[in-house]
Amino acid sequence: MEPRINDLQVESRVHELLDFPVHTNQISSAIYECPNDHIENPKKKPYNCPHSGAKCDVTGDIQRLLLHLRNDHNVEMSDGRSFSHRYVHHDPKHLHHATWMLTLLDCCGRKFCLYFEAFHLRKTPMYMAFMQFMGDEEEAMSFSYSLQVGGNGRKLTWQGVPRSIRDSHKTVRDSQDGLIITRKLALFFSTDNNTTDKELKLKVSGRVWREQPVSI
């Protein structure tokens, strides 16, 4: 008579055959265990450096990236839910001479990246401002932000949801998910009333807030 093998013995044998054993239970998804006994949660994988000025291979958690951005990339940080920054482009006729700007924001107990840069959309010179959340997409969805550029009696406002830095800076920019201004229109917003294409000065202001959950 052949010996009977119960389910627990089968499961134990299967786990022994796996290079990366799996912890399972009845209410949660699988969590994979590495050979060094470290448990890997897919949602906690390292973040890539959000600095877009040059290719940077640094990865890590949010605290490590904050130190890296401030110490190695000299990125400044602002505190508070409201902010105002001035962007100056000395030669708006040539976007390849333009500089882009990254500022870190500390508000609502979380960190955000504020980008402003010049680029070409097909052949049209554009300026774009947008924000990204330093965390995962699920939590990013609980925040909203607004950006506004104004000057000379004109005002343009954008409101949106910050994308997670899990999405690359280029992905967000190419999807046009932010405040976009053509160069021609940007000159009308220039704070020194400059329409000679010699210099562009834009004041970009905004705020961040956490959305309240809707009660049913």
From Swiss-Prot:
Q: Which UniProt keywords apply?
A: Cytoplasm, Metal-binding, Nucleus, Zinc, Zinc-finger
Query: Which residues belong to zinc fingers classed as SIAH-type?
Result: 5-74
Taking the first listed entry, what is the main subcellular location of this protein, grouped into a coarse class? Answer: cytoplasm
Phenotypic effect of disruption: No visible phenotype under normal growth conditions, but mutant plants are hypersensitive to drought stress.
Task: State whether keyword Zinc-finger applies.
Answer: yes
Induction remark:
Induced by abscisic acid (ABA) and salt stress.
Coiled-coil positions: none
For this UniProt entry, the molecular function terms from Gene Ontology, in alphabetical order, are: protein homodimerization activity; zinc ion binding
Q: Which residues form the signal peptide?
A: none
Subcellular location as annotated: Cytoplasm; Nucleus
- Tissue expression notes: Expressed in roots, rosette leaves, cauline leaves, guard cells and flowers.
Q: Which GO terms describe its cellular component?
A: cytoplasm; nucleus
- Please name one Pfam family that this protein belongs to: Sina_ZnF
The record describes the protein's role as:
Probable inactive E3 ubiquitin-protein ligase that plays a role in regulation of autophagy. Upon starvation, involved in maintaining ATG6 homeostasis by competitively associating with ATG6, a component of the autophagosome complex. Acts as a positive regulator of drought stress response. Functions as a positive regulator of abscisic acid-mediated stomatal closure.
What this protein is called in its record is: Probable inactive E3 ubiquitin-protein ligase SINAT6
Q: Point out the gene that encodes the protein.
A: SINAT6
